[in-house]
């Protein structure tokens, strides 16, 4: 599972000319589900997203999390995070989970954020969406659940 996390002062998602999700200060989370991803990974990434200290404290240091600031999250599914561009000019998306697997995992991710006490807005799975945001910083972080399976220290490999 992959998440592109952007710190925002506001963000919204529109489908068919209608805003279906909007947040103020918080995180826009573009979430891709890969083949083999599980609900455990959805919960792990949600917890990591909620607790990442990427908001400034009173001294301007990254010491506060989304939970600490009482921020919101806008979760938008994005299978294109699994684009394979190694061959040719047209990306392959064969590493992305099929919709019947991905949709419940995106929902599990959003539900876990809500369980942690975060107000969550969401896109519409499978729809053509327009996403608007005001980047704050900018701060953009990439999370990949595959990395959490690897040893943290190079010497542990």
Curated annotation (Swiss-Prot):
GO molecular function: D-tyrosyl-tRNA(Tyr) deacylase activity; Gly-tRNA(Ala) deacylase activity; Ser(Gly)-tRNA(Ala) hydrolase activity; tRNA binding
UniProt cross-references to Pfam families, sorted A to Z: Tyr_Deacylase (PF02580)
GO cellular component, as recorded: cytoplasm
Reactions this protein catalyses: glycyl-tRNA(Ala) + H2O = tRNA(Ala) + glycine + H(+); a D-aminoacyl-tRNA + H2O = a tRNA + a D-alpha-amino acid + H(+)
Keyword presence, Hydrolase: yes
Subcellular location: Cytoplasm
Record-listed E.C. numbers: 3.1.1.96
Any Gene Ontology biological process: D-amino acid catabolic process
Motif Gly-cisPro motif, important for rejection of L-amino acids: positions: 137-138
First-listed, main subcellular location of the protein, grouped into a coarse class: cytoplasm
Domain of life: Bacteria
CDD domains: Dtyr_deacylase
Protein keywords: Cytoplasm, Hydrolase, RNA-binding, tRNA-binding
EC top class named in words: hydrolase
Presence of the UniProt keyword Transcription in the record: no
Comment, domains: A Gly-cisPro motif from one monomer fits into the active site of the other monomer to allow specific chiral rejection of L-amino acids.
Family statement: Belongs to the DTD family.
Subunit structure: Homodimer.
Biological role stated in the UniProt entry: An aminoacyl-tRNA editing enzyme that deacylates mischarged D-aminoacyl-tRNAs. Also deacylates mischarged glycyl-tRNA(Ala), protecting cells against glycine mischarging by AlaRS. Acts via tRNA-based rather than protein-based catalysis; rejects L-amino acids rather than detecting D-amino acids in the active site. By recycling D-aminoacyl-tRNA to D-amino acids and free tRNA molecules, this enzyme counteracts the toxicity associated with the formation of D-aminoacyl-tRNA entities in vivo and helps enforce protein L-homochirality.
The protein, known as: D-aminoacyl-tRNA deacylase
UniProt organism field: Roseiflexus castenholzii (strain DSM 13941 / HLO8)
Gene name linked to the record: dtd
């Amino acid at each position: 599972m992959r998440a592109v996390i952007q710190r925002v002062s506001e963000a919204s998602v529109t489908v068919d000319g209608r805003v279906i999700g909007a947040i103020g200060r918080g995180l826009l989370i573009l979430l891709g589900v890969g083949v083999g991803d599980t609900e455990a990974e959805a919960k792990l990434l949600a917890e990591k997203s909620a607790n990442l200290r990427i908001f400034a404290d009173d001294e301007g240091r990254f010491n506060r999390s989304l939970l600490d600031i009482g921020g919101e999250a806008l979760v938008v599914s994005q299978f294109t995070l699994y684009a394979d561009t190694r061959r040719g000019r047209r990306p392959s998306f064969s590493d992305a989970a099929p919709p019947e697997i991905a949709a419940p995992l995106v929902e599990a991710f959003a539900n876990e954020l809500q369980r942690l006490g975060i107000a969550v807005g969401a896109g519409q799975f499978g729809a053509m969406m327009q996403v608007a945001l005001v980047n704050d910083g900018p701060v953009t972080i990439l999370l990949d659940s595959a990395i959490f399976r690897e040893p943290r220290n190079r010497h542990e490999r």
